[in-house]
Structure formats: structure tokens, C-alpha cells
Amino acid sequence: MYQYLTYPRDGYDEGSLKKDLIYKLITIHNTESSHLKKLKSYYMGEHAILKHTRRNVNAPNYKTVANHAKDIADTATGYFMGNPIKYNNTADGDIDELLTAFDGAEIDQVDAQNALNMAIYGRAYEYIYAKEGLTELDSTSIDPENTFMVYDDSIERKPLFAVYYYEVKDDTKDTTKYQAEVFTENLHYHMVLRSTDSGTTQSEEATPHNLGQIPIIEYRNNHFAIGDYEQQISLIDAYNSLMGNRVNDKEQAVESILVLYGTQLADTPEDAKVAMKILSEEGLLELPG
């Protein structure tokens, strides 16, 4: 379920966003991020059935994964973006320069990734930025698990700023930094929230991004930002369980053993346990006459 993160417009000043505020919002978003990670794991074929165990460790335990989640998302994305979006000039304006910029940013690939993210997560985020050392604009799709938009508390829910948070590892020094990029309408904050080599920091650097609007765009799959297979996960789990149980039943039938009447496996309970273990593992037991 999509969670709106809000901030009072009356007290909002884009020039004075603090690390503590951003850290609190990230903590709130993390509760939803765990659900988004689950949606991604189902797309990747990491289903609940893979954690299934049986009381009898020697019994067949096939963990069949029918990845309908990926089938649904890929099919929906193919129908949606099988043909790239076309942009045409109109009588009101010439967009040739925009089309040239789109080609340079490989916008077709960005659109396709956004569509797939919407199918998986129910939402997608596109980041518009200037290439390093250049004035040319580029575009990329960023991970919904680490991105969110903050809205004002008005009836219109106007976006105030966007947050993209991530970790940076330095394997040469065995350190990790947890950073956030915060974008308002006019400013870009780079915040180092925490560093393993120096602890919590107060790094809050704000610079103009000169784009005139928040450079992160949020797209929703629908009003409630529900992914294409999100509400079918319980059915996918049930199907995986059913198929696994069927295979287990077949395997148990193949490995069935003979029931003995009128004789004993052993003279003592301890020897009987040993004999039953041999039967369960080998499916065969020799009884001398």
C-alpha cells in the first residue's frame, strides 16, 4: 500500500532542510521498503516456498517455483512499452531539440525500465540530471526501494522534495557511508547520514541544481501504486505449494517400501530404529531367514 509522506507547507523552507528530518523520513520509508524488497524478490524467483521445511528431514521436499510474478510483469511491460513512445511536433511548438536530448539520454530504455518498475513495485522514479562536466541533460531510472517523494499537507498534495538514499562501500578501507540526495524545486542537498569510520555526521551541503523543478519524477502504476502481481502473491504461493506437494507425493510413491507382516525388523527397539532408518534411506532391508 502506497504511503504518503507529508510535511507542513506552512513550516517548509527549502533552504533549511536538516539531516535529522531526512533521517526520520528515511526511517519511516524503510517500513515500506521491506515490502518493496519482497515484491522484487518474487520477480527474481525468490519465493516463500524456498524456505519450506518438512518434519521428516529424509522425506522428499521439492521446492518448485513457478515464477508467475516475472511472467505477469514482463508481459504487462511488453504490452505497455513494446512500441516506444512517440513524440511529435505540433502546431504550437517545435520539439526537435527535445527529441535530440531524448535520443542522447536513450529515453526509450529509461521508459522501459520505468514501466518494469511500475509493474514490480507499483511505482517508478526517474532522475533528470546534468552529465558530469557538461550542460547536457541525461535521465535514468532509480530504485524505488531507496527513493520517495515528500508532499505538502494541502488537499492537492503538491510535491515538496524527493529523497534518494543509498550506501557507499570503500573496500580498500573497509568502511561504509550512508548518504542521501535530497532535491527540492531549486536545491540539491548532499547529506552523509552516517559513516562507519566516523559515526554520525552532520554533512548538509546545498547547491542550486538550476532545473527549476524537482528533478525526480514519480510515476504510479495506478492510484494506489499497486504492482501488477502484488495482489496475486498468495495465489503464487499456493500454486508453488500445490506443485511441490504433488511432486513430493510422486517421489514418495516411487520410494515406497514394503510393509512386513508376521515378522519383526529387530529384536530390540534400538535395533528397530536403526532398521527403520535404513528402510527410509535405502528403501531396502534384508531379513535373514
Language-model features: where?
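Short linear motifs in intrinsically disordered
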Residues: 113-119, 152-153, 264, 276
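Extended, charged amphipathic alpha-helical segments
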Residues: 200-289
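Extended, helix-rich architectural segments
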Residues: 1-139
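Charged, low-complexity, helix/coiled-coil-prone segments
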Residues: 37-48, 52-64, 178-184, 241-259, ...
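Extended, regular secondary-structure scaffolds
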Residues: 115, 125-224
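N-terminal start-of-domain structural block
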Residues: 1-37, 192-226, 230, 234, ...
